[in-house]
Protein backbone atom coordinates (compact mmCIF):
# COMPACT_ATOMS: atom_id res chain seq x y z
CA UNK A 1 0.00 0.00 0.00
CA UNK A 2 1.48 3.38 -1.05
CA UNK A 3 0.41 6.81 0.07
CA UNK A 4 1.48 10.20 -1.16
CA UNK A 5 2.62 13.04 1.07
CA UNK A 6 -0.77 14.69 0.64
CA UNK A 7 -2.71 11.87 2.32
CA UNK A 8 -4.11 12.38 5.77
CA UNK A 9 -2.03 11.77 8.89
CA UNK A 10 -4.38 8.89 9.75
CA UNK A 11 -3.34 7.02 6.62
CA UNK A 12 0.31 7.76 7.39
CA UNK A 13 -0.06 6.32 10.89
CA UNK A 14 -1.82 3.22 9.55
CA UNK A 15 0.88 2.75 6.91
CA UNK A 16 3.63 3.06 9.52
CA UNK A 17 1.84 0.61 11.83
CA UNK A 18 1.41 -1.91 9.01
CA UNK A 19 5.18 -1.74 8.44
CA UNK A 20 6.07 -2.22 12.12
CA UNK A 21 6.89 1.46 12.65
CA UNK A 22 5.49 3.15 15.74
CA UNK A 23 4.60 6.84 15.57
CA UNK A 24 4.95 9.39 18.37
CA UNK A 25 1.93 11.50 17.41
CA UNK A 26 -0.13 13.83 19.58
CA UNK A 27 -3.62 15.23 19.28
CA UNK A 28 -3.92 18.18 19.34
CA UNK A 29 -0.26 19.10 19.87
CA UNK A 30 3.07 17.77 21.16
CA UNK A 31 2.67 20.06 24.18
CA UNK A 32 0.10 17.64 25.58
CA UNK A 33 3.10 15.56 26.63
CA UNK A 34 4.26 18.48 28.80
CA UNK A 35 0.79 18.90 30.31
CA UNK A 36 0.89 15.27 31.48
CA UNK A 37 3.87 16.17 33.67
CA UNK A 38 1.48 18.27 35.77
CA UNK A 39 -1.99 16.79 35.44
CA UNK A 40 -3.98 13.89 34.07
CA UNK A 41 -5.61 15.65 31.13
CA UNK A 42 -8.62 13.67 29.89
CA UNK A 43 -10.69 16.42 28.27
CA UNK A 44 -9.83 18.04 24.93
CA UNK A 45 -8.20 21.44 24.71
CA UNK A 46 -7.34 23.58 21.72
CA UNK A 47 -3.73 23.72 20.54
CA UNK A 48 -3.98 27.49 21.06
CA UNK A 49 -4.38 26.93 24.82
CA UNK A 50 -1.26 24.83 25.40
CA UNK A 51 1.39 27.58 25.69
CA UNK A 52 -0.61 29.54 28.27
CA UNK A 53 -1.47 26.38 30.22
CA UNK A 54 2.17 25.21 30.33
CA UNK A 55 3.35 28.68 31.37
CA UNK A 56 0.80 28.75 34.20
CA UNK A 57 1.57 25.22 35.40
CA UNK A 58 5.36 25.71 35.40
CA UNK A 59 5.05 29.05 37.21
CA UNK A 60 2.85 27.47 39.89
CA UNK A 61 5.28 24.57 40.42
CA UNK A 62 8.31 26.86 40.51
CA UNK A 63 6.63 29.16 43.04
CA UNK A 64 5.76 26.19 45.25
CA UNK A 65 9.34 24.96 45.06
CA UNK A 66 11.15 28.28 45.56
CA UNK A 67 8.56 30.47 47.27
CA UNK A 68 9.27 33.15 44.65
CA UNK A 69 7.24 34.39 41.71
CA UNK A 70 8.36 32.76 38.47
CA UNK A 71 8.87 34.64 35.20
CA UNK A 72 8.83 31.49 33.07
CA UNK A 73 7.18 31.81 29.65
CA UNK A 74 6.77 28.70 27.52
CA UNK A 75 8.64 28.80 24.20
CA UNK A 76 7.95 26.20 21.52
CA UNK A 77 10.98 23.99 20.72
CA UNK A 78 12.86 25.04 23.87
CA UNK A 79 15.70 22.47 24.16
CA UNK A 80 15.70 22.97 27.95
CA UNK A 81 12.07 21.98 28.43
CA UNK A 82 12.76 18.53 29.89
CA UNK A 83 15.19 20.06 32.38
CA UNK A 84 12.62 22.73 33.25
CA UNK A 85 9.94 20.11 33.87
CA UNK A 86 12.16 17.87 35.97
CA UNK A 87 13.69 20.88 37.74
CA UNK A 88 10.35 22.08 39.03
CA UNK A 89 9.57 18.66 40.45
CA UNK A 90 7.50 17.11 37.68
CA UNK A 91 7.31 13.33 37.62
CA UNK A 92 8.18 11.88 34.21
CA UNK A 93 7.04 8.38 35.21
CA UNK A 94 3.64 9.77 36.24
CA UNK A 95 3.42 11.60 32.89
CA UNK A 96 4.10 8.29 31.12
CA UNK A 97 1.38 6.53 33.17
CA UNK A 98 -1.23 9.24 32.51
CA UNK A 99 -0.45 9.45 28.79
CA UNK A 100 -0.53 5.67 28.48
CA UNK A 101 -3.85 5.37 30.36
CA UNK A 102 -5.44 8.01 28.16
CA UNK A 103 -4.08 6.40 25.00
CA UNK A 104 -5.44 3.01 26.06
CA UNK A 105 -8.90 4.52 26.64
CA UNK A 106 -9.32 4.76 22.84
CA UNK A 107 -9.79 1.57 20.88
CA UNK A 108 -10.64 2.64 17.33
CA UNK A 109 -8.15 3.65 14.65
CA UNK A 110 -9.83 6.97 13.91
CA UNK A 111 -6.89 8.75 15.50
CA UNK A 112 -8.32 12.22 14.86
CA UNK A 113 -11.00 11.49 17.48
CA UNK A 114 -8.40 10.52 20.11
CA UNK A 115 -8.39 13.87 21.88
CA UNK A 116 -6.53 14.40 24.03
CA UNK A 117 -3.98 11.72 23.24
CA UNK A 118 -0.25 11.45 22.77
CA UNK A 119 2.03 8.57 21.89
CA UNK A 120 5.16 10.52 22.88
CA UNK A 121 5.35 8.44 26.05
CA UNK A 122 6.31 5.44 23.87
CA UNK A 123 9.28 7.34 22.46
CA UNK A 124 10.30 8.48 25.95
CA UNK A 125 10.13 4.90 27.26
CA UNK A 126 12.28 3.80 24.33
CA UNK A 127 14.86 6.53 24.97
CA UNK A 128 14.93 5.74 28.69
CA UNK A 129 15.46 2.04 27.94
CA UNK A 130 12.10 1.12 29.49
CA UNK A 131 10.37 -0.25 26.38
CA UNK A 132 10.17 -3.97 27.23
CA UNK A 133 9.21 -5.13 23.73
CA UNK A 134 12.05 -3.17 22.14
CA UNK A 135 14.52 -4.40 24.76
CA UNK A 136 13.51 -8.02 24.08
CA UNK A 137 14.02 -7.53 20.34
CA UNK A 138 17.49 -6.06 20.94
CA UNK A 139 18.40 -8.93 23.31
CA UNK A 140 17.27 -11.48 20.69
CA UNK A 141 19.36 -9.79 17.99
CA UNK A 142 22.38 -9.59 20.27
CA UNK A 143 22.02 -13.26 21.26
CA UNK A 144 21.63 -14.32 17.65
CA UNK A 145 24.83 -12.45 16.78
CA UNK A 146 26.67 -14.00 19.72
CA UNK A 147 27.19 -10.68 21.48
CA UNK A 148 27.63 -10.45 25.24
CA UNK A 149 24.88 -8.59 27.04
What role is predicted for each listed range?
Residues 2-149:
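C-terminal accessory helical subdomains adjacent to catalytic cores in phosphodiester-
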Amino acid sequence: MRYSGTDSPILSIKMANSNGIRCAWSNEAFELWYIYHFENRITPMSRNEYAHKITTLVREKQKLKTGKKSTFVYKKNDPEMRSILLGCGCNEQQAIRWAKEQSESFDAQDYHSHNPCTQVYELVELLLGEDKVFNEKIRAIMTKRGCKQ
